[in-house]
């Protein structure tokens, strides 16, 4: 069996749960390890619940080898091109989703705008926590 080399593997890291510290920052040690991995031919990308803007801010100079999965995996965002590809859509379900969401208690509603900003339509405890981290 042929051994897989580091440059033949893409590592997908959960940014929010694995790499960030309790304060929601990317510690220098993790940043250094990611950069060392990449400098040795490792291929890396991240998954995050956060917006592309927030992920870029957290990663700083860490370069990704593939689009990041952001906004909870609903968007594949290529930072080198500054563009994203939607991985899911509510197309065709707008009426049912828009009718159902307002009646759900405790559910926050936020929209990710094309410019990367987030607009809260209805706040919840979870959404407040998430937006503070972003």
What are these regions (language model features)?
Residues 12-17, 113-115, 133:
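Generic detector of low-complexity/intrinsically disordered segments
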Residues 2-4, 10, 59-60:
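Short loop/turn motifs at secondary-structure junctions and domain boundaries
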Residues 3-6, 102-104:
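Flexible, charged surface loops at secondary-structure boundaries
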Residues 25-127:
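Active-site phosphate-binding/coordination module
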């Amino acid at each position: 069996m042929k051994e897989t080399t580091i440059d033949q593997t893409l590592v997908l890291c959960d940014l929010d749960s694995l790499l960030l510290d309790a304060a929601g920052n990317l510690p220098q040690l993790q940043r250094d390890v990611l950069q060392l991995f990449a400098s040795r031919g490792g291929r890396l990308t991240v998954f995050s619940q956060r917006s592309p803007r927030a992920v870029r801010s957290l990663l700083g100079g860490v370069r990704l080898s593939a689009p990041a999965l952001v906004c909870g995996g609903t968007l594949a965002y290529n930072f080198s091109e500054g563009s994203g590809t939607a991985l899911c859509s509510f197309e065709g379900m707008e009426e049912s989703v828009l009718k159902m969401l307002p009646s759900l208690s405790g559910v926050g509603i936020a929209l990710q705008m094309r410019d990367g900003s987030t607009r809260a339509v209805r706040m919840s405890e979870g959404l407040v926590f998430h937006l503070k981290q972003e």
